[in-house]
Amino acid sequence: MRITLPSGTECEIDRTVANPKMGLVIAPDIFSLRGLYDVLVKRLANEWQMAVCAVEPFPGKTLGPEIEPRFAAVPELDDDKHLRDLHEAADALGTAEVGLMGFCMGGMYCFKSARSDRFKKIISFYGMITVPDGWKSATQGEPLEFLKNG
């Protein structure tokens, strides 16, 4: 089910499991929320018996299926706003404990989320440990620095 966070960012959420022991926030790859994540959210909720939410990484943008506009949009992303969205998604799950899982660009944001105590466990798949040159900007911190400094 699609919801809108207080920030205005869209998420796919599944809270159908009764009394979940834990919640899971998913940070998608550069291709954003799509059918793949709708299925993944539902599947992980059912198989792992938890509340699950996937967060749109490019809120308010229509980037299309090509990768070039997406690469060009990454420097415009703001680490603080992205972390806020991940926190709001965690709150929407309604569980005391929440993990964070990310894929590729979302995995990089998992590393950047190490500065927060909100997530009990963080799992990054293929996340960049340094910001690629074409993505660097004043609003993009270095993942290794966030991991190092917490």
Positions of PLM-derived features:
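A short beta-to-alpha transition loop/helix N-cap that caps and shapes the active-site region
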Residues: 61-65, 129-135
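A conserved short beta-strand
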Residues: 118-130
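The feature captures the conserved acid-bearing segment of alpha/beta-hydrolase catalytic domains
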Residues: 132-150
